[in-house]
Amino acid sequence: MATNPLSILFVASEVEGLIKSGGLADVAKALPEALVNLQHDARIAIPAYTAIPDVCDDEVILDTHLETWPHTHYQVKKRFLGDNPVYLIACGHYFDRPSMYAENNQAYTDNGERFAFFSAACLDMLPKIGFQPDIVHANDWHTGLVPFLLKHRYGQDPFFAQTKSILSIHNAVFKGVFHYDEMQCLPEFHCRNVPDAAVSSTHMTMLKAGVMNADKINAVSPTYAEELKTELGSHGMAWEFQQRAGDLVGILNGCDYSAWHPDTDSYLPINYKATKQSMVRGKNGCKRALQEQVGLPIKDVAMFGMVCRLTHQKGVHYLLPVLTEFLKLDVQLVLVGTGDPLLAAQLRDVAAQFGEKFVFVEAYNNQLAHLVEAASDFFLMPSEFEPCGLNQIYSMAYGSLPIVRGVGGLKDSVCDYDVNPETATGFVFYEPTAQALLITMQRALLLYAQNLTELRRVQLYAMERDFCWNKAAEQYVELYRSALK
């Protein structure tokens, strides 16, 4: 019985290949794809944003309405993403907009209502289209009401009698907090007293609604699962995660090697494999190409890279206080990113002072992001917190040793050189200070300067690590089966 294929509906607000703003979209594509590879029936549901290319041309498989909702009419459209069926919930009132979540850096004022509608429609459509999943897998606050509604609205419905819910936490900073007045389309909130969703007497949070009602919860790394049980790590929801500790597990995200692999990466001027001769030739060629592209002197020097959003989370505030001191060493650094204008201004000032050593590219460019990974000897991720992180995994694949703070998925995926040189894949520091970061960058530079042969061995070892999605998917299947018991 345990080997029977499962049917899964993966519900998310975005998916790579259709529309994307962050890492959730990567998971929403890669995990269902890996589940199909394991012979399970995994389907995806997302809103039919008009920003999705050709969404108007998709086949309409259901034209219906949602009871109790004023903007009741919706359609379900269907297309395929590889071998995965995708259901697109179309409702012009909510999703006929230029963007997914915001315009001009202002969140849509009805986001609570929009994603409450989407969550309700995802469950409403299932008996109408005849798809009876074993598991409904929700993600982050946008779909936190899916487990809530499955329990409170559909708990006695025979169609859903065997259906269980999973909630994945990709980033607990964002909780989907809304006033009860914004939830009046849901009869479940008319009483304004919903303990398993309430954050105050006037407001509820969709994330809490999901956490308190999902059959199982997972964080996107084992360490992040532990951090969620603390006030600091959960950003104010420690009690809720502690209450559900027995149903909370951590599963490290996988890596989509079809998009991130130096042997096949079309963005690189030279491809290379995990052999010493190939790697050295490829990385040296990519380093020269990066130096030419960003205007750094062409020289054989330790190259440090960083590609990130300029936010407090990504640890730029740890780098800035020691950046000038670091750049006095024989190094080059390329930092690519956009975000906080104050951080950007400080980085521009340092770049103007150290133009021969430091380039700040205030833009996101996918080609440049790939080239930085390949050209760098070391890749900086001094994050304040990092639920999973992917760039450290990309870095290892490209032989660029990650320098990370030991939090979340960074702690779970990077092994520090000084702790165990034989199995090292990078450098780790724990103290949340700029000085701790500087010391760790100096440790890395020392290895480059004093023992290049050893550095190449560690880089090759890192390249051989395997974080494929099939491994993560097998752990998700175990989680699904535990929910069904």
Curated annotation (Swiss-Prot):
EC class name: transferase
GO BP: glycogen biosynthetic process
Chain residues that bind ADP-alpha-D-glucose: K20
Enzyme Commission numbers on file: 2.4.1.21
Keyword Transferase attributed: yes
Domain of life: Bacteria
Disulfide cross-links: none
Pathway: Glycan biosynthesis; glycogen biosynthesis
Pfam family, one: Glyco_transf_5
InterPro entries: Glyco_trans_1 (IPR001296), GS/SS (IPR011835), Starch_synth_cat_dom (IPR013534)
Catalytic activity, reaction form: [(1->4)-alpha-D-glucosyl](n) + ADP-alpha-D-glucose = [(1->4)-alpha-D-glucosyl](n+1) + ADP + H(+)
Tagged with keyword Heme: no
One annotated Gene Ontology cellular component of this protein: cytosol
HAMAP family, alphabetized: Glycogen_synth
Family label: Belongs to the glycosyltransferase 1 family. Bacterial/plant glycogen synthase subfamily.
Functional summary from the UniProt entry: Synthesizes alpha-1,4-glucan chains using ADP-glucose.
Name of the featured protein: Glycogen synthase
Phylogenetic lineage: Bacteria, Pseudomonadati, Pseudomonadota, Gammaproteobacteria, Vibrionales
Gene: glgA
